[in-house]
Amino acid sequence: MRRCYLSSLAPLKIRLLALHLNRQLITMTTARLLFLLLGFSISSLELTANDRPNILFCISDDQSYAHTGANGDPVVKTPAFDRIVKEGLRFTHAFCDAPTCGPSRSAILTGQPIWRLEEAGNIHSTLPAKFATYPDLLQKSGYSIGYTGKGWSPGRLEPGGRTENPAGPPYQQKRLQPPFKQMRNTDYAGNFATFLAQSPKEKPFCFWLGTSEPHRGFESGAGKRTGKDPSKVIIPPIFPDNDIVRNDLLDYFVEIEHFDSQVSRAIALLEKSGQLDNTIIVVTSDHGMPFPRAKATLYDDGSRIPLAIRWPKGITQPGRTSDALLNLSDLAPTFLEAAGLKPPGMMTAKSLLPIFKNQASKNHKAAFVAMERHDGCRKGGKGYPCRAIRTSDHLYIHNFEPTRWPSGSPDPSVCARAIPYGEIDSSPTKTFMMEYRNKHGIARLAELAFGMRPTEELYDLKTDPHQMNNLAGSLLLAKTQATLRKKLFDHLKTTKDPRVTGGLVNWDHYPYYGVIYTKGWTVDPSPTSNIQSK
């Protein structure tokens, strides 16, 4: 380091200036050394508080890709999402890491797939403290952090060694009268306003705004009471086309619109405070819609989610659409790199910054989705382990335990929730499909939703966008099937999935912290570890 030495004959003002510069240089050097000792990238020091972007992460609960205005739905109204699309970047092929709440959120927070996260790969579990999370790393580097609504959930923090939600300190005080009864009364945007008011102005912030909508239950008839026309609803071919399903979808749309209204209010707060253009705004969902053959499956209706990002200072040519294939876990390294931090080595997800800059990304040619135990809906707490690779043209799924019921057992006595096919949320659509499953026109749809599945599934997305015709075993696609199988298993080996590397597989035996309605229902203890005694 070069220091300034001046003769004692130099004018006093110049000597005082030189002394000030020396002290500044020493202070900067000390700060750099301290930062390195804390394990952060030196690049973050090159960004001032004004340069480091704020982060507002807005996440709905159970919303499929198709159900926004910008993504083409003619009924649901999402002006906030549509604005982020218009002023930012829309992703057409974003996928959750797992189509179930807790594991998906664990992957988002840690930047890792669920098979690397031990019990966090299950819902109603815990997220071990040894796994670094992006909010914690940002806080250590000088960010204010917080969350409102649904952060990491559902599960228990204490068994994983945590005392605070991984999304940050809670801001839950403000309440409102929701438009319909089944919606939460949390004032999500109001709590964000409280966070902004309490955060030091000189520090950047990272805030998680997570609604419980559109998670079930819904108020029956809510959609029609808002004036929505059931005849205009686009019915996915995986569902029967009738008034029951149409009105169920309308009620779901109303919940999405509540989420969008909260995002709109949050954007207005940023505009009013002058922080909008230095804030990365992300609007997305944790996984797909709470309907049969959607949520808790690896098909697109369960795993493909809306994603739009606005960041004027970091996204070139705003208004673009990207068809890159990505997972939501890619957001963690993206946020860290945007803040000038180097993601820790345990984060295997890949930053989206090259895509922000409209550069080709070799890391986003395929997405990978996985599931272990969703709700405890098989005897002894068994899950339905499966992995998938999604490319632009095909979806390949490998089911590791094809003799198990994929949507939960039809016998409610072996389900913790005491309902048949318990991994599908109760709903008018599910009830209708179960009651009329033997009727003409319903039988095949019911079999797709509730029936058994083979070890391998392969779908041609150009001819079968809702993945209804399994082509695994077809001679015409034998090469494609082999190629995708290899790509999937190579990725699982590289990222150390114990399902394929031969490591300890305990997902069927980790404790279940959800509500148990079935008397005597328990998780079978592990034959290879004492994990049940945790």
Residue ranges and their predicted role:
Residues 7-8, 44:
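Serine residues within intrinsically disordered or low-complexity segments
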Residues 16-27:
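Short, Lys/Arg-enriched N-terminal segments with co-localized hydrophobic residues
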Residues 35, 40, 45-457, 465-490, ...:
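Formylglycine-dependent sulfatase
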Residues 493-496:
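Short arginine-rich
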Residues 504-508:
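A glycine-rich phosphate-binding loop feature that marks nucleotide/adenosyl-phosphate handling sites
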